[in-house]
């Protein structure tokens, strides 16, 4: 008979509290006095808590004997992300993530740590605590979401989207999180060990969340909820009997088929499910696939999708949506990983998710007790997470759910297979110096990085304030803030660019121009820097220099008719009519439709 493991409940409880606190903060925390009020603070919280949990994991190494496969798969993912980041052309984006995304190496390493911690520490005895947290987060989300949808938001957001952006800054992300929580709440109604009040809130909370998803206009949220809750009811049906399970599965497959057809403007569900944004995702996916095909080993670079999209997008995209509209993500997590990290990162992420599915199957085969229903609830929420990840961005406030839920599924399955049990009586402990030391060192190192990032975000926010052009003191203060932004260590390159443009605008031309050239030197694919440089040289009549940068833009963004028009005008200003006519022919070859025809008409007037 195998020895039964009895992990210390005091240690586990403390570790679980940190994991749940991470979920709470990463989902709900935002800070309005930052340039990026949502993604940056969430990434800091994620990095710091993950760093602290390292000590907890080091103290629990002896319990990983039955989890070797899990550790190897997560390590493979983290190592793949590190290799891709090291070989990426722009290290800042690779390690810290792109502007207003923050999906760099440090974020994925932190998510990997959270995954392992969830697998190691979260057990069925923690489920009441877990679902209480879900109720708390959902309650806050309901209150704030209702305020937003009624026009009572206490923050005056500069928001081009639906008002219901929640605590994640985007209605699609908010709807995704609400779908996951609605799945967890509605499925927990079937937990007989929950009180009547808890089960009542499960129903009411889930219904309100579904209403808010509908009010957000994010159809993907409804589909994610449907996928999750259907998974739960299929498992519930199979638990009753096989015939009922097969019937539920058949019905679900039929509904999924009609839903997909509806999204494609076919069938009775079209009026409910089709949105133009569904079609646009096809362009994002195709571009990502082409990036992977051209860069199969290491991809284009960690979180670098936005710097390559304009080069890989089909000509129909700008003609439909505008020449200056772009995307910084493939809107499909798997395609995103393959595009940015090549086969190395893509396969490692795919392997991780297949391992989660394997763990779930093993648990369902070997356990038919009361815990099966709880496991089914968590699995269904994980399905809901992945349903939205197939059509959306890997946002940290959403991603944290997938990694915690996935890790929990693996941990519960492995513990069930190895007969792990909790000790009957927890020991009182003094401070664990080993754990504290291994937690404090990485946390301190991450804190030093976070301090600089907070400075950069806060200064960039201040740099966006207005100034009085006629007041020399006001202009000088404005310029000083811009210089502080530019000189902040670890500052986002695009924040530096913005402040450099402000310096040029207020007369400190040489300094601002030097910064933009430095940005271009470090990242030749930064199209915004190229636009700034070409625009500046056009403004002073140096058309030869402007042409150099416009031609670089043409390589990175070949279907941008607006850039081509300006390039043609620069050639004409230098008297090179042959080149301007050549540019006119190029514009004429594709620039049609609502967005293209006006540019073509203008080009025919100015370049012929």
PLM-predicted stretches and their roles:
Residues 1-103, 111-136, 188-203, 230-253, ...:
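Transmembrane signal-anchor hairpin modules in multi-pass inner-membrane enzymes, especially those
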Residues 148, 153-165, 275-278, 290-291, ...:
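Interfacial juxtamembrane loops and adjacent helix segments
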Residues 170, 210, 289, 319-358:
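A conserved mid-to-late transmembrane alpha helix and its immediate loop/hinge
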Residues 495, 529, 563, 596-598:
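TPR alpha-solenoid repeat register
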């Amino acid at each position: 008979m195998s020895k039964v493991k009895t992990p210390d409940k005091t240690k586990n409880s403390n570790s679980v509290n940190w994991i749940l606190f991470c979920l709470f903060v990463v989902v709900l925390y935002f800070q309005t006095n930052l340039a990026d009020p949502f993604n940056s603070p969430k990434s800091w919280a994620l990095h710091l808590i993950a760093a602290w949990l390292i000590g907890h994991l080091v103290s629990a190494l002896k319990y990983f004997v039955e989890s070797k496969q899990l550790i190897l798969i997560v390590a493979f993912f983290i190592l793949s992300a590190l290799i891709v980041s090291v070989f990426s052309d722009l290290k800042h984006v690779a390690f810290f993530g792109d502007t207003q995304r923050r999906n760099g190496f440090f974020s994925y390493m932190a998510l990997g740590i959270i995954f392992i911690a969830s697998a190691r520490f979260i057990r069925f005895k923690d489920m009441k605590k877990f679902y209480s947290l879900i109720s708390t987060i959902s309650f806050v989300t309901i209150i704030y979401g209702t305020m937003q949808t009624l026009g009572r938001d206490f923050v005056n957001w500069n928001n081009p989207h639906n008002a219901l952006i929640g605590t994640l800054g985007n209605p699609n992300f908010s709807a995704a999180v609400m779908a996951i929580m609605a799945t967890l709440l509605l499925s927990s109604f079937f937990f007989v060990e929950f009180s009547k009040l808890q089960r009542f809130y499960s129903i009411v909370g889930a219904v309100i969340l579904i209403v808010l998803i509908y009010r957000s206009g994010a159809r993907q949220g409804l589909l994610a909820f449907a996928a999750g809750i259907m998974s739960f009811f299929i498992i519930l049906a199979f638990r009753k009997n096989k015939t009922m399970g097969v019937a539920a599965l058949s019905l679900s497959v039929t509904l999924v088929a009609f839903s997909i057809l509806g999204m494609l403007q076919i069938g009775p569900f079209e009026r409910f499910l089709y949105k133009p944004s569904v079609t646009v995702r096809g362009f994002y996916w195709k571009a990502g696939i082409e990036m992977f095909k051209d860069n199969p080993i290491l991809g284009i670079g960690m979180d670098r999708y936005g710097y390559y999209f304009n080069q890989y997008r089909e000509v129909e995209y700008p003609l439909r949506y505008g020449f200056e509209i772009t995307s910084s993500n493939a809107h499909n997590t798997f395609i995103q990983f393959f595009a940015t990290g090549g086969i190395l990162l893509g396969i490692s992420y795919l392997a991780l998710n297949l391992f989660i599915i394997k763990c779930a199957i093993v648990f369902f085969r070997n356990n038919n007790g009361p815990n099966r229903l709880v496991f089914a609830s968590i699995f269904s929420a994980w399905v809901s997470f992945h349903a939205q990840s197939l059509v959306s961005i890997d946002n940290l406030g959403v991603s944290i759910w997938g990694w915690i839920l996935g890790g929990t599924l693996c941990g519960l399955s492995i513990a069930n297979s190895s007969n792990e049990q909790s000790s009957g009586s927890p020991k009182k402990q003094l401070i664990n110096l080993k754990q504290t030391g291994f937690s404090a060192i990485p946390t301190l190192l991450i804190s030093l990085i976070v301090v600089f990032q907070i400075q950069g975000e806060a200064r960039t926010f201040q740099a966006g304030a207005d100034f009085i052009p006629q007041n020399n003191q006001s202009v000088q203060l404005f310029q000083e803030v811009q210089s502080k932004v530019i000189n902040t260590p670890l500052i986002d390159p695009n924040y530096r660019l913005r402040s450099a443009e402000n310096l040029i605008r207020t007369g400190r031309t040489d300094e601002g121009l030097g910064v933009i050239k430095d940005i271009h030197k470090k990242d030749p694919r930064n199209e915004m820097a190229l636009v700034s440089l070409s625009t500046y040289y056009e403004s002073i009549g140096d058309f030869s220099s402007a042409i150099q940068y416009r031609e670089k833009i043409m390589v990175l963004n070949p279907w941008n008719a607006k850039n081509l028009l300006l390039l043609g005008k620069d050639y004409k200003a230098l008297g090179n009519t042959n080149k301007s006519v050549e540019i006119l022919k190029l514009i004429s070859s594709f620039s049609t439709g609502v967005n293209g025809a006006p540019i073509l008409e203008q080009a025919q007037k100015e370049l012929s």
